[in-house]
C-alpha cells in the first residue's frame, strides 16, 4: 500500500535498537524505550529539505503511529524533526 503524507509531514520507519547491551545482557522489549531515530519512507510534496532514505532524529513525543501492510510507521510533522544524520 502506498502512503503519501499531506501538509508538512513525513512517513518514518523507526530504526530498531539492539536487544542486548555491550556486555551481552538481553533487554526485554517492555524495558526498552522507543528509538528517536528513523528512516524516511515517504515525504510530502511540500517538503524539499528531506528525501526518502534520509536518517532523521525526531522529538520524543512527536508523530502519530500507524500500521501499513503489517509494518509500524510514524507520521511526523516537519516541526517534530530535529535533524538529519549524515
Swiss-Prot record:
**Chief location of this protein within or outside the cell:** cytoplasm
GO CC annotations on file? cytoplasm
Question: Which organism does this sequence originate in?
Answer: Campylobacter jejuni subsp. jejuni serotype O:2 (strain ATCC 700819 / NCTC 11168)
**A biological process from GO:** chaperone cofactor-dependent protein refolding
| Keyword Chaperone appears in the UniProt entry | yes
As for what it does, the entry says: Together with the chaperonin GroEL, plays an essential role in assisting protein folding. The GroEL-GroES system forms a nano-cage that allows encapsulation of the non-native substrate proteins and provides a physical environment optimized to promote and accelerate protein folding. GroES binds to the apical surface of the GroEL ring, thereby capping the opening of the GroEL channel.
Q: Which Gene3D superfamilies match?
A: GroES chaperonin (2.30.33.40)
Q: Name one GO molecular function term.
A: metal ion binding
| Protein name as catalogued | Co-chaperonin GroES
Recorded hits in NCBIfam families, A to Z, give:
PRK00364.3-3 (NF001537)
InterPro entries, per the entry: Chaperonin_GroES (IPR020818), Chaperonin_GroES_sf (IPR037124), GroES-like_sf (IPR011032)
Query: What intrachain disulfides are recorded?
Result: none
Q: Where, per UniProt, does this protein localize?
A: Cytoplasm
Family stated for the protein in its record: Belongs to the GroES chaperonin family.
Q: What's in the keyword line of the UniProt record? A: Chaperone, Cytoplasm
Q: How does it associate, per the subunit comment?
A: Heptamer of 7 subunits arranged in a ring. Interacts with the chaperonin GroEL.
Amino acid at each position: 500500500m502506498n502512503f503519501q503524507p499531506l501538509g508538512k509531514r513525513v512517513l518514518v520507519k523507526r530504526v530498531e535498537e539492539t536487544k542486548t547491551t555491550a556486555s551481552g545482557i538481553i533487554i526485554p522489549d517492555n524495558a526498552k524505550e522507543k528509538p528517536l531515530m528513523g528512516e524516511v519512507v515517504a515525504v510530502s510534496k511540500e517538503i524539499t529539505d528531506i528525501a526518502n532514505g534520509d536518517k532523521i532524529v525526531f522529538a520524543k513525543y512527536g508523530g502519530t503511529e500507524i500500521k501499513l501492510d503489517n509494518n509500524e510507521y510514524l507520521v511526523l510533522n516537519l516541526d517534530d524533526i530535529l535533524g538529519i544524520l549524515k
